[in-house]
């Protein structure tokens, strides 16, 4: 018998697996290897909600935990996936400058918000009122991280590449059985895949579609992350990631021309240089009505638990939530009610 079965290898799955490895727990992962939010997301780590210039839920705490966590994964996987870059928010009007100065005085923001407005010196970026600058920010190459972690598990023969069959899961006196595998616990971290599992139908998970593009723009020459309705993230070699859209109505797989038009419209308001589109990708983020993660042990089946609802802040939230769930299962540490699965009526 092993300690854990993990279903799904996105950011939440990788985070929980890494926590298990750090605590010498045995586990296997079941994952179908198809596109997930972790493979198409922007990967930004930023504790400030730029639309309102306010700290996100537990932002400083999440930042303090997430970056060392990913750094330890870099060592294990022998990769570089953490990329530091300031975020420059375009000040659309003079009133934005006052809001920015006010935000810089909030205690939870001081470590990240520069009080001084940065003047625009890039000739192809439209920012007549300058930028509000965030420091200690950047992005994680989540696609690389998930890919390399998958290879690591394959080399250790602890990855089963298959679609999880919910009907094949059996409950035993000491845990669960799935095929020939017996385990003390099974943890579901498969994002929107959880929606089709009847055992979790009481959780109001939603599929929120996001699309982004990768462009090539030789004249942009910008290393900072630019935000002005969309993010522009430098990938090197004159390539930039542009995104992302949020669509609650479109449930179809694949990219859309409407999303491309929306991204291009916003991008053309920011830059005046010629560019061409290299690729466009789409994925679904799992979200909840209150925009909070959902983690914990199933109210009826104590052998099964979940980490889900990361939304667009999975890079920051996944390591934190993985740690909370592990400590809850192994040590009985309470999970905060605002992200506890028990906030939804079973």
Enumerate the language-model features and the residues they cover.
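Beta1/beta-strand and adjacent pyrophosphate-binding region of the FAD-binding site
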Residues: 1-10
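Hydrophobic anchor at the start of a short beta-strand
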Residues: 4, 26-28, 110, 186
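Active-site substrate-recognition segment that forms the wall
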Residues: 12-19, 23, 32, 43-44, ...
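Dinucleotide-binding Rossmann-like beta1-alpha1 core, especially the glycine-rich loop
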Residues: 44-123
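Short beta-strand to alpha-helix junction loop
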Residues: 53-65, 132-148, 254-259, 316
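Helical element adjacent to the flavin cofactor pocket in flavoenzyme catalytic cores
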Residues: 132-185, 189, 193
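C-terminal catalytic lobe of FAD-dependent flavoproteins
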Residues: 276-346
């Amino acid at each position: 018998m092993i300690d854990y079965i993990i279903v799904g290898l996105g950011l939440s799955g990788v985070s929980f697996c890494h926590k298990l490895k750090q605590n010498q727990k045995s586990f296997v992962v079941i994952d179908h290897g198809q596109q997930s939010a972790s493979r198409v997301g922007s990967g930004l780590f930023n504790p400030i909600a730029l639309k309102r210039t306010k700290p996100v839920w537990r932002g400083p705490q999440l930042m303090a935990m997430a970056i060392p966590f990913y750094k330890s994964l870099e060592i294990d996987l022998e990769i570089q996936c953490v990329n530091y870059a300031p975020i420059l928010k375009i000040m659309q009007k003079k009133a934005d400058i006052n809001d920015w100065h006010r935000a810089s005085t909030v205690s939870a923001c001081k470590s990240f918000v520069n009080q001084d407005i940065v003047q625009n010196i890039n000739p192809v970026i439209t920012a007549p009122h300058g930028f509000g600058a965030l420091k200690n920010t950047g992005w994680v190459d989540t696609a690389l991280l998930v890919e390399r972690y998958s290879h690591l598990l394959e080399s250790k023969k602890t990855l089963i590449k298959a679609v999880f069959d919910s009907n094949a899961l059996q409950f035993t006196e000491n845990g669960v059985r799935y095929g020939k595998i017996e385990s003390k616990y099974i943890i579901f971290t498969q994002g929107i895949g959880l929606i089709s599992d009847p055992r979790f139908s009481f959780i109001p998970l939603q599929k929120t579609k996001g699309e982004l593009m990768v462009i090539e723009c030789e004249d942009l020459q910008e290393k900072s992350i630019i935000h002005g309705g969309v993010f522009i993230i430098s990938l090197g070699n004159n390539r930039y990631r542009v995104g992302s859209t949020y669509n609650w109505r479109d449930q179809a797989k694949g990219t859309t021309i409407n999303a491309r038009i929306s991204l291009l419209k916003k991008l053309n308001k920011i830059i005046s240089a010629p560019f061409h589109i290299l690729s466009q990708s789409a994925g679904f983020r799992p979200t909840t009505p209150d925009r909070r993660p959902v983690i914990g042990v199933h109210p009826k089946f104590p052998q099964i638990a979940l980490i889900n609802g990361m939304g667009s802040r999975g890079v920051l939230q996944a390591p934190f939530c993985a740690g909370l769930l592990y400590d809850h299962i192994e040590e009985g540490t309470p999970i905060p009610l605002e992200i506890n699965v028990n906030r939804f009526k079973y």
